Amino acid sequence: MASSQKLWGGRFTGATDPLMTAYNESIHYDKRMFNADIDGSKAYAKALEQRGIISADELDKMLDGLEAVRDEWKTNKFTLQPSDEDIHTANERRLGEIIGTGIAGKLHTGRSRNDQVTTDMRLWLRDELDIIQKSLVGLLQVFVARAESDLDIIMPGYTHLQRAQPIRWSHFLLSHAFSILNDLDRLKQIYSRVNRLPLGAGALAGNPFAVDRKFLQKELGFEGVIMNSMNAVADRDYVIEFMFWASMVMTHISRLAEDLIIYSTSEFNFVTLSDAYSTGSSIMPQKKNPDSLELLRGKSGRVFGNMMGFMVSVKGIPSTYNKDLQEDKEPLFDSSKTVLDSIQILTGVLSTLTVNPENIAKSLTADMLATDLAEYLVRKGVPFRETHHISGSAVRMAEERNTTIDKLSVEDFKSLHPLYEEDVADVFNYESSVEKRCAIGGTAKSCVLEQIQTIKKALE
């Protein structure tokens, strides 16, 4: 391709190697930012008119032309040309065809693709964050609804994947919901740092025509202006921060997916996935595979890889803009889509999930109440370290007799400590056990209801 067809072609006399042209272009993935690019150009055109760089008539033509370009993108009528290196060159080329290059050529006055591209990215990401935030709220609402409807189901709580203590199923769900609620809070913080204006920074040294950056800030809805022009064009912290956030939320999604995969197995059978989020086997007719959950777990690694790959790309580049920064877009776009899809899939899984209370109840075992047995003596003044040992001795006694601790007699317990009395049998009640965990954050019904209200209030 002749260099004269390119925005930067005046310096060059030779044609670019075709492979280099393909290697250099980004239009096939950054074209999704067409709206952001047009919004940025419209605002910049207005700033140029304010400074007398273009006339009011030229501004009107630019604004109308840019809207015509936008309409072509929206209606899939925009035709890409070989010279369209990226979304910025494509839009400027098409604008020139519509209103003439004499006017369109003034649009880039004082503007560099360096400040243009990062403005587009911030505008695009800002819109994505709004969509993701709404999806997170929807997911949390499903968590709350399920926690309310399943409040009376008591299940084994696990540590080290070993049965530990009885808890409410709702308490388990809300443990994951609070992680997602923290993700929502972090997302709001990220938004404020994304929502800062780089436009008007030029290539690196600033704008030579004194465009009003405060006007650009208000026109494009940014919260503030990036005060250093070099930082404005070089900064990709907001990309990395979003990808870190995406990795964090995918970690939380993956951990819940793993729990539900385990609980959906025939060995547990605590839950049954809806057919809408399951698949079968090509050879084994009886299979119902939790592919939705496995993909949620698997795609977390994809998002982690996007973050690490881009961090490696930027860790050693010198100041301001370098072409390495073009590698920010594909991982950003992919992480955003993957996270949004994952949130929506998890929302569907949870809203259609069938809980099997009878199977859950069958999994409750008396040994899970060994701590309660120790606490029985604590309430009578015996030090916990001593009661822990005594309760452990009761567990061992039951194992040696090939029975469970709730089958031991009062005399058996008295042989371990004289303060055990007839009411020790009351220890072996799962409902009573969970209701004792009544400090803030516990699994008692009152505490779980308080947790539900906390999340509801946070979503107001």
Swiss-Prot record:
**Gene Ontology CC terms:** cytosol
Annotated catalysed reactions: 2-(N(omega)-L-arginino)succinate = fumarate + L-arginine
Which terms in the Gene Ontology molecular function aspect does this entry carry?
argininosuccinate lyase activity
Active-site residues (renumbered): H160, S281
Q: Name one GO biological process term.
A: L-arginine biosynthetic process
Which pathway does the UniProt entry assign to this protein?
Amino-acid biosynthesis; L-arginine biosynthesis; L-arginine from L-ornithine and carbamoyl phosphate: step 3/3
Which residue positions does UniProt flag as site: Increases basicity of active site His? E294
Give me the residues that bind 2-(N(omega)-L-arginino)succinate, please: S26, N114, T159, N289, Y321, Q326, K329
Listed name of the protein? Probable argininosuccinate lyase
The record lists the organism as Schizosaccharomyces pombe (strain 972 / ATCC 24843)
Q: Gene name on record?
A: argx
